[in-house]
Each structure stands twice: as C-alpha cells, then as structure tokens.
Amino acid sequence: MDAALLLNVEGVKKTILHGGTGELPNFITGSRVIFHFRTMKCDEERTVIDDSRQVGQPMHIIIGNMFKLEVWEILLTSMRVHEVAEFWCDTIHTGVYPILSRSLRQMAQGKDPTEWHVHTCGLANMFAYHTLGYEDLDELQKEPQPLVFVIELLQVDAPSDYQRETWNLSNHEKMKAVPVLHGEGNRLFKLGRYEEASSKYQEAIICLRNLQTKEKPWEVQWLKLEKMINTLILNYCQCLLKKEEYYEVLEHTSDILRHHPGIVKAYYVRARAHAEVWNEAEAKADLRKVLELEPSMQKAVRRELRLLENRMAEKQEEERLRCRNMLSQGATQPPAEPPTEPPAQSSTEPPAEPPPAPSAELSAGPPAETATEPPPSPGHSLQH
C-alpha cells in the first residue's frame, strides 16, 4: 500500500490500494465515468454505509454535470482505469452524502424509475424531508462527519462513445433537443406510430421539466417553459386517445386546467376523453367551455357533439338490448315446482334433496366502445 497522497484539495487524502493501467484518462466535460464504490465511517469498525457491489451494478456520473457530491468528481479524475484507491474526506465534503445515499438506496430498491445513477434533478427535492427514512442516514445528517470512500475506476467513456440520455445533457443541449423531439413526435403521430410519438413527447417534457426546476415559479422564464410543457402534454394526450387510454388523458388534462383554466385545447381534448367513457354531461360542459373561449372552433365542437350523441344513442340501445335479453332469459326458465311433503320413508333411507333453485345470468361486460374520428394531427389547431 502506498503512503497517503495529498491531493491539491483541502480536506482530502488519498491512498492507492491497487495501481491502475495506462495513462491518466482524458476527463473532458461530458465524459461518463463508471466505477464501484464503498462508503465507510472513520470509526474503529470502519462501518460500511453503502457498497455498490452489494447492489450488483456499478455507478456512473457525467463529468461537468454538477453532480451533487462534487468531491467525487475530484476523486475520480485523479485515478487511472482499474485503479483502486481509498479517500479520506473531511466533513466539508461529506455533508450532502446522506441525501445522495438515500437516493441511491431507493434506486437500488426499485423505487426510482431511473437506473443506478444520480443526477441533480433527482436530488433537488430531497432537502424538503425532515427524515431520510433511514436511521443511519438521519444520524449522519444531524452530525456530519468525515467519511472514507474506496473507489475502483472501471471505465471512462468520451462523450462521443456512448448515447447520452436526456438527463445527461447540459441545459443548452436540453433546450436545443426539445424542438427536435417535438418535431419527431409530430412526424411519428402523422404516421400512426403513436407509441413512438408519445415517447418523443415524454422525453421533451422531461427536458423542460428539468430546466424549469432551475427557474423561480411563475416568473417569465418559468411560464415560458410551462407553456411549452403544456403543449407537449396535450400532444402526448392525443397519442393516449389513439391508444384508448382515456382515463390517463382525463388525469393530465384536468391537471393542466387546475393550474391554467384558460387553455382551450385542454378542454377540447378532455371533452373527447369524457365522450369515450360516456361522461355525457362532462363532455358537453367542456365543449361549451371551448366555444366560450374560442368561438372559431364551432365546427369542431358541432362534430364532437354529433359523435357524442351517436355514442350515447348506441350505448342506450345496447343497454336496452341487454335488459331485454335478461328478461327473456328469465321468461324461458321453467317455473319452480311448489314444495311437496316428502313421502314417508323408512329410517334407513336418506331424505330427498330439494330441487336446485333456477338462476338467471346477471353479469355483463362493459358496453361496447364506438369508433371516433381521429384528433387533428399535430401541427394543426390542436397541436404545435
């Protein structure tokens, strides 16, 4: 084991446990660094707090992406590939570790939709919690202390060597990606590839949501991003209509209207979803609101009202036929015979069983759905 090596950083001490190979990698901005780590206390037992090998997958961070535990970027950029080193880090560098650890543990347990990595937006809301949900982490948060990190550097990928996920992009790259994703979603929608289109819209929404967390709510830039997000959500909802996921459409559109009650397209899309699940009164109320806010949409509203009327008539006819079938089934069943006294039996014969009562089949499936005209394609009055 080499003697302790001091990095040019206050409160950090490094000891190389196993030498690496080759030259020091070129850690340029956007490089992906893959590594295993073990975090320990500085007590006599060297109590293990976290160990990525126990999770079964290595961790990775992106250089220059404002990783919350900034000291890790400093530690990793001092290492060669396959090097194993131990780093002692003073309290000035470890105060945020309990919050990071909580996020890592939740991901390992499958509670977070992302994989075994951490990024800024995933940590932004952690400070709102009074407890982290883990006793050892609560203790660390109340009483920050120096920690030891044992790190094995596995791989360093240049930005051009891997496909960067949306969250890996810089703020500028995210903003540039949004119109590209939006346009690709519109193209796929027109081709009838609704699943792929919805994925593009979702990816663009994630970019904008991440950018929005960096702005002060309800100020100019925040509202600009909010408008873009709502447009994309409504495009996404049109994909959901095509996929017959009507209740999710109702959820998204209602959420938009709770915060922005003047968005005409949200009322229109919600009206169509209400119509598909036979919420006649709600659909008509939303269509009236569309006309109130945008009289020029009278033609589209009349068309939706006709479709709604036809849909409700079909449903009523289906219900009428179902009731008639149930009544006719009951009429064809033989009447139950009146009970009679059983004949005298000897003590050795068992008593006669009573005849089973006739039963009518009462269960029925949901009413059949009716076809609807497709929504205006992206790029027209309902989609930007």
Curated annotation (Swiss-Prot):
GO terms for cellular component: cytoplasm; nucleus. It is found in: Cytoplasm; Nucleus. May be important in protein trafficking and/or protein folding and stabilization. GO terms for molecular function: peptidyl-prolyl cis-trans isomerase activity. Residues 359-372 have a biased composition (Low complexity). Its main location: cytoplasm. Residues 328-384 are annotated as: Disordered. Gene3D superfamilies: 3.10.50.40, Tetratricopeptide repeat domain (1.25.40.10). TPR repeats lie at residues 178-211, 230-263, 264-297. Residues 53-145 form the PPIase FKBP-type domain. This is Aryl-hydrocarbon-interacting protein-like 1.
